[in-house]
């Protein structure tokens, strides 16, 4: 069995090696010739999976995408051909939620404006939006949710209109898929008028899709409103962000909000489970076996951490400033964006760090944030 796989997908060999011949490829430049005799195709969001790519392959048995979204896959085409498809919904939700939360802590420290006491509006209450809300609510932050689709589906959570959210939120975090038409179109959801309407001193965090914000309009608005603070992990025109926009972002990264080791492993592992199910063979590998030990065995807490100490704990796990510096130095180089993504292998989730605390104060919130070993 030939398994054609994006070369940047981790843990493929230990999971799929016993199932067939693994053929690594560049996912962004993948050609029909490279997949014409594949039995299995495993991709990420940089690969367009459609008739143009697959028409020459008569034997494909499974397509898997190690991603939350599916906008890069022609699902109707796969269905017509009877090719099973699976993605990995929620695989990197924890990573994205923690990224957004850490970014807010970093902004709070940079501008001496505590996160505690602010109101955060989350646009899009799916897996990543919910994971962001989980972090914020664990820390005691008031969260407003906007998601008209979830609301219409009967989701029991309380939702507000986008206008209400814009009016009340001090921080806005975007977590919607890209939809280019229809009643709930998200393409340029934040256009010039909406950006100009943001409250004074709003923080805007985007780690969903670059096109959700009109980037050209964002440049224009930032030229007029220095009070708006931006965290941008995604960009229109990836892998070629608008160079004029980068200096306006407080933190800029190359679409890696979901790139924790845990999230990457989870995405590949979910596809492994699905393929084993299709082949009717036992999935006898374990996710925990894939991850390396964390470089800190445990951190002893002498007292309940304040916001400054919480940021330091977060930096033990992931220091956003490092990726920001690498991005500014490398995004304009040839293939710089993709090279940074490919080389991004170091980040862990809060769960990798064990905290030891034996005081009397309530620290369940640290456990709810995701840290392990709290109070043990």
UniProtKB/Swiss-Prot annotation:
Biological pathway: Cofactor biosynthesis; pyridoxine 5'-phosphate biosynthesis; pyridoxine 5'-phosphate from D-erythrose 4-phosphate: step 2/5
Species assigned in the record: Shewanella sp. (strain MR-4)
An MF annotation (GO) of this entry: NAD binding
Major localization listed first in the record, in broad terms: cytoplasm
UniProt KW Lyase keyword: no
Subcellular location(s) per record: Cytoplasm
Cited function: Catalyzes the oxidation of erythronate-4-phosphate to 3-hydroxy-2-oxo-4-phosphonooxybutanoate.
Record EC number: 1.1.1.290
Ligand binding (substrate): 45, 67, 259
GO CC, any one term: cytoplasm
GO biological process, one term: pyridoxine biosynthetic process
Protein name per UniProt: Erythronate-4-phosphate dehydrogenase
Keywords recorded for this protein, A-Z: Cytoplasm, NAD, Oxidoreductase, Pyridoxine biosynthesis
Assembly: Homodimer.
Entries under PROSITE patterns matching the protein: D_2_HYDROXYACID_DH_3
Pfam families tied to this protein: 2-Hacid_dh (PF00389), 2-Hacid_dh_C (PF02826), DUF3410 (PF11890)
PANTHER family, alphabetized: D-ISOMER SPECIFIC 2-HYDROXYACID DEHYDROGENASE CATALYTIC DOMAIN-CONTAINING PROTEIN-RELATED (PTHR43761:SF1), D-ISOMER SPECIFIC 2-HYDROXYACID DEHYDROGENASE FAMILY PROTEIN (AFU_ORTHOLOGUE AFUA_1G13630) (PTHR43761)
Gene encoding the protein: pdxB
Listed InterPro entries: D-iso_2-hydroxyacid_DH_PdxB (IPR050418), D-isomer_2_OHA_DH_cat_dom (IPR006139), D-isomer_DH_CS (IPR029753), D-isomer_DH_NAD-bd (IPR006140), Erythronate-4-P_DHase (IPR020921), Erythronate-4-P_DHase_dimer (IPR024531), NAD(P)-bd_dom_sf (IPR036291), PdxB_dimer_sf (IPR038251)
Residues that hold NAD(+) according to the record: 147, 233, 258
Family in the record: Belongs to the D-isomer specific 2-hydroxyacid dehydrogenase family. PdxB subfamily.
Catalysis performed (reactions): 4-phospho-D-erythronate + NAD(+) = (R)-3-hydroxy-2-oxo-4-phosphooxybutanoate + NADH + H(+)
């Amino acid at each position: 069995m030939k398994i054609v796989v994006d070369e940047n997908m981790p843990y493929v060999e230990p999971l799929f090696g016993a199932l067939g011949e693994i053929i690594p490829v560049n996912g962004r430049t993948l050609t029909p010739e490279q997949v014409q005799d594949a039995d299995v195709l495993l991709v990420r969001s940089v690969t367009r999976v459609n008739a143009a790519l697959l028409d020459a392959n008569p034997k494909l048995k499974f397509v898997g995408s190690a991603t939350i979204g599916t906008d890069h896959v022609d699902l109707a085409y796969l269905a017509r051909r009877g090719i099973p498809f699976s993605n990995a919904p929620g695989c990197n939700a924890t990573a994205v939620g923690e990224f957004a939360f850490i970014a807010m802590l970093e902004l709070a420290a940079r501008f001496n404006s505590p996160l505690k006491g602010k109101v955060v509006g989350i646009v899009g209450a799916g897996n990543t939006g919910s994971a962001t809300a989980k972090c914020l609510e664990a820390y005691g932050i008031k969260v407003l949710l906007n998601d008209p689709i979830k609301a219409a589906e009967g989701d029991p959570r309380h939702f507000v209109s986008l206008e209400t959210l814009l009016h009340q939120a001090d921080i806005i975090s975007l977590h919607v898929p890209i939809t280019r038409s229809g009643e709930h179109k998200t393409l340029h959801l934040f256009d010039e008028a909406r950006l100009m309407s943001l409250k004074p001193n709003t923080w805007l965090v985007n780690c969903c899709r670059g096109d959700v914000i009109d980037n050209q309009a964002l440049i224009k608005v930032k030229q007029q409103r220095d009070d708006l603070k931006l965290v941008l992990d995604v960009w229109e025109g990836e892998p070629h962000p608008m160079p004029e926009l980068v200096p306006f972002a407080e933190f800029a990264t190359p679409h890696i909000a979901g790139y924790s080791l845990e999230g990457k492993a989870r995405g590949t592992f979910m596809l492994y489970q699905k393929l084993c199910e299709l082949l009717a063979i036992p999935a006898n590998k374990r996710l925990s076996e894939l991850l390396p030990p964390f470089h800190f065995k445990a951190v002893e807490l002498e007292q309940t951490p304040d916001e400054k100490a919480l940021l330091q704990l977060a930096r033990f796990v992931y220091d956003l400033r490092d990726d920001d510096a690498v991005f500014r130095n490398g995004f304009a180089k040839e293939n710089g964006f993709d090279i940074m993504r490919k080389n991004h292998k170091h980040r862990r989730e809060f769960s990798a760090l064990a905290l030891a605390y034996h005081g009397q104060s309530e620290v369940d919130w640290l456990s709810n944030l995701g840290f392990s070993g709290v109070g043990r």
